[in-house]
Amino acid sequence: MTLESGFTRTATITLLAVCLGLGAAGVPASALAKHSDQHRYLTEQKNRTDIPGRYEPLTFAEFLALPAIPEKYTASEWDTVRTQTQRGVGLEGYIAEVIQAADGATYGRPPDQGDLHVHLRAARQPQCGVGGLRNQQIVTEVTPHFQPPTTGWSYEALLDLCQRQARVRISGWLLHDYQHIRDIGAWRASAWEIHPVTSIEVWSPEREEWQRLR
């Protein structure tokens, strides 16, 4: 794990998308075939490789106040989702758990090469793991496009932050995952996520500054 104070890796990530043979939204055609408009849009958003021009800081309260959208979108709800998913946002907190998802097919990869779920809570946790109030956590996801070798955001590096209960600031694109609305109140507080994550910073008490996790 390496920390730096600066520069995003837009050019590197864009080059990776080209090398993988991904489309403009970074989506493998196989992941879009024979699905609903909602599913196709969700897959396109998950596969984004562009970096937001800026990040709007949100508190946990502000994140939880994002519009409540049902599982099936009406025309007006489509407008809301499309507007919200163009926002780059940042959220500060503590990593409660890190989970390797077996959803690689979403990204045109083998199942075991899927997302890294990084679940944030507002307060420091007694320990890293799945205990405690899981219904109060915000889901953020590091997609395969932003995992090593593009970045150093490996499962081990993120788990280390969780075990140390380091304060982090995770930023990226807003995404509404309608497929997990029924999980609200179980292991998540909202269907809104930061997904994909495009920036991870760690607070340094010694330097009194945020340092980017490379």
Regions found by a protein language model. Give the residues of each.
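N-terminal secretory signal peptides that target proteins for export/translocation
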Residues: M1-F7
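Generic hydrophobic-segment detector
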Residues: F7, A11-I13, T83, C162
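Bacterial N-terminal signal peptides
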Residues: A11-A24
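OB-fold and OB-like single-stranded nucleic-acid-recognition modules
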Residues: A29-R214
